[in-house]
Amino acid sequence: MGKTDLSYTLADIAFRIGAELRGDGSVEVKGLATLQKAQAGQISFLANKNYLKHLKDTCASAVIIPSSFADQCSTNVLVMENSYFGYALCSQLFSPQWWSMSGISPSAAISESAKLGAGVTIGANVVIEEDAEIGEGAVIGPGCYIGAGSIIGAKTQLRPNVTVYHGVNIGARALIHSGAVIGSDGFGFAPNKGDWAKIAQLGGVVIGDDVEIGANTTIDRGALDDTVIETGAKLDNQIQIAHNVKVGAYTVIAACVGVSGSSSIGKHCMIGGGVGIAGHLEITDQVQITGMTLVTHNIKEPGVYSSGTAVEPNASWRKNVARFRQLDQLARRVRVLEQGGRRKSDAD
C-alpha cells in the first residue's frame, strides 16, 4: 500500500497494535509497503522466512517482525510474535475512509416507518422500506436497497449497490461489499407431472456481528427456518450460500465456493476456493477443506480434507483418464487372480 494522508509515529503504532518498539519512537510513518518496495516513511513486515533475504536491504523506516529475526534488521523494529496479525492491525490504521458523503442524501427514499439510529450515513439513491431499522453509526452506500423489516446493526457498512431483501437481520460492525445480495429466494421447487411448483421461501437470514461478506456473494433466505452466518465469519467474493445453510462463528470461506441447501459448517473452519459442498451435510468445527474439493458426505472429525486431481501435462492427464476408465475391469481381474491364488493355496 502506498502513502496516504494518514500519519503516525512509531511509538503510536506500537501502542495501537500491541508491539514492542525497539528504536526511535518519534519516527513518522505515512504508509505500508513490502520489504522490497518500502521507502523512508513507510513500515513493512516479515511474516514468512522466505522473505528474510530482503530484510537487510529494506529501506522501510520500521519492520513488524518476530523476536527471532529482530536482531537481523538494521532499522527500527516493532516486535510481535504474530507479525502477520500485526501487519493486519497496522493496515487498518492506514485504510482511508471509503465514503466522502455525510448525513442522509436528499435522493434517498426512506419509508416513514423506518428507524434510523444516531449518526447514520445514507448515500444517494438508497431505498429503505417500511419498518427497516438502521443502527447507530451505520453507513449505507449509494444505490443500496434495504427491504421491509430488515435490521442493519450499529456501525455496519454496506458498500455501494448492496441488496438486502426483507426480513434480514445483520449484526453490528459487519462489512458487506458491492453487489452482494442478502435474502434472495432459495432454490426450491416441487416436481409435479413434469412441471415445477415454486416453494415460497418463508424464512429469513441472520448474520452475526463482525461478519464480512465479499462482492457479488449471494446468501439465500431460508425456506422455513433462517439461513445463519454466525459472528466473525468471513466470506470472500462470488460465494453462493443456499437456503437454510449455517456457517459457524469465525469460519472463513474463499471465493467461488457453493454451499448447497441445509448444510451446516462448523466454527473456525477454513474453506478453500472453488469448493463444492452438497446439501444436507454437517461439517464439524476446525475443518480445513482445500481448494476445488467436492464434499459429498459428513465430516465428523477436525482435520484437512481434499479431493480432485492436481494439474499435470495434458498428455499425461489423457493417459491417466484412459487408465481410470479401466479401473473396474482391472479390479475384476485382480479379484479373479486373488481367488485363483487362494484356490491354489487351499489345494496345497
From Swiss-Prot:
<dbReference type="InterPro" id="IPR011004">
    <property type="entry name" value="Trimer_LpxA-like_sf"/>
</dbReference>
<comment type="function">
    <text>Catalyzes the N-acylation of UDP-3-O-acylglucosamine using 3-hydroxyacyl-ACP as the acyl donor. Is involved in the biosynthesis of lipid A, a phosphorylated glycolipid that anchors the lipopolysaccharide to the outer membrane of the cell.</text>
</comment>
<keyword id="KW-0444">Lipid biosynthesis</keyword>
<keyword id="KW-0012">Acyltransferase</keyword>
<feature type="active site" description="Proton acceptor">
    <location>
        <position position="243"/>
    </location>
</feature>
<dbReference type="GO" id="GO:0016410">
    <property type="term" value="F:N-acyltransferase activity"/>
</dbReference>
<keyword id="KW-0808">Transferase</keyword>
<comment type="similarity">
    <text>Belongs to the transferase hexapeptide repeat family. LpxD subfamily.</text>
</comment>
<keyword id="KW-0441">Lipid A biosynthesis</keyword>
<protein>
    <recommendedName>
        <fullName>UDP-3-O-acylglucosamine N-acyltransferase</fullName>
        <ecNumber>2.3.1.191</ecNumber>
    </recommendedName>
</protein>
<dbReference type="GO" id="GO:0009245">
    <property type="term" value="P:lipid A biosynthetic process"/>
</dbReference>
<dbReference type="InterPro" id="IPR018357">
    <property type="entry name" value="Hexapep_transf_CS"/>
</dbReference>
<dbReference type="GO" id="GO:0016020">
    <property type="term" value="C:membrane"/>
</dbReference>
<dbReference type="InterPro" id="IPR007691">
    <property type="entry name" value="LpxD"/>
</dbReference>
<comment type="subunit">
    <text>Homotrimer.</text>
</comment>
<dbReference type="Pfam" id="PF04613">
    <property type="entry name" value="LpxD"/>
</dbReference>
<dbReference type="Pfam" id="PF00132">
    <property type="entry name" value="Hexapep"/>
</dbReference>
<dbReference type="InterPro" id="IPR020573">
    <property type="entry name" value="UDP_GlcNAc_AcTrfase_non-rep"/>
</dbReference>
<comment type="pathway">
    <text>Bacterial outer membrane biogenesis; LPS lipid A biosynthesis.</text>
</comment>
<keyword id="KW-0443">Lipid metabolism</keyword>
<dbReference type="InterPro" id="IPR001451">
    <property type="entry name" value="Hexapep"/>
</dbReference>
<keyword id="KW-0677">Repeat</keyword>
